[in-house]
Amino acid sequence: MGYWEWEEMRDAFGFTMEQFIYFGGFPGLAPYINDEDRWRKMMEDSIISPILNHDILDIEEIRNPPLLRQVFELGSIYSAQEISLTKMQGVVNSGTVPTISSYLRILDETMLIKPLQKYDNSAIKTKNSIPKLQAYNNAFRNSYCQHTFEEALMNKTEWGRQVESAVGAYLAGRAILDGFELLFWRDEKKNECDYVLKKGERLIAIEVKSGHADNIDGYHAFMKKFEKNIVNSFIVGPEGLPLEDFFRLNIPSLFRTSLK
């Protein structure tokens, strides 16, 4: 599935950056963003339901379609957050952990929800880590969001989550197009780096801050621990790389040349 990027939505529909972050990159739904109830209904009727109820079922054998939808909804709601498969099983109250894992794989292959693994030098630890779920388009997240666009803008904590999820959505799509792995990092002290891009042994560290970059200990801890492999690192936000510049980055070039 192809999603429109920031500059395309801006040029075609006059989207502001804030509108792109919240409503995502579905050109067919752009005319409805000023009527959010209608926009959400259109998201469900013209995007989500056709994909889950028809497109995926045409190409995959899904024994429990309601569970597939529940996993998708959880992935959307928890976009840019960690959640264990065991916890997901408890929330949906059905299915097995292997089934949920297989449905996440299908949602990843169809560019809906990506389960990010935690970066580790050990491939086994990476594979067995608690995933950080990432919607491929922030429109999925906000189809289920309890905050309207204006409410999200006014809520500092919520808007921070919106921005992080939008950045992750862009990176998830570029990972497929540009051929790199998208991961995250957290250590036993709960130091965290929001996104880690990996190509071969080369790493790029990205931290997302929608406001003041005042809590970036995890970002620095990651760079210190994996200094030999990091070829680029930067903060996305008002005190780092502006969102307008981030969304037009040539990411493959960052594995070759420092952004600094």
Q: What does each model-identified segment do?
A:
Residues Y3-T16:
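Conserved small helical "lid"/interfacial subdomain of P-loop NTPases
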Residues F13-S49:
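Amphipathic alpha-helical "lid/sensor" segments that cap RecA-like P-loop NTPase cores
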Residues E36-R202:
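Accessory nucleic acid-recognition modules appended to NTPase machines
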Residues R174-L177, F222-V231:
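Arginine/glycine-rich "motif VI" loop of SF2 helicases in the C-terminal RecA-like domain
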Residues R202-A213:
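Active-site ExK catalytic segment of metal-dependent nucleases
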Residues H212-A221:
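Active-site-adjacent loop/helix micro-motif of nuclease/hydrolase catalytic cores
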Residues V231-G237:
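Short, hydrophobic beta-strand segments that form beta-sheet elements in well-ordered domains
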Residues P238-K260:
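Domain-level recognition of nuclease-like catalytic cores that cleave nucleotide substrates
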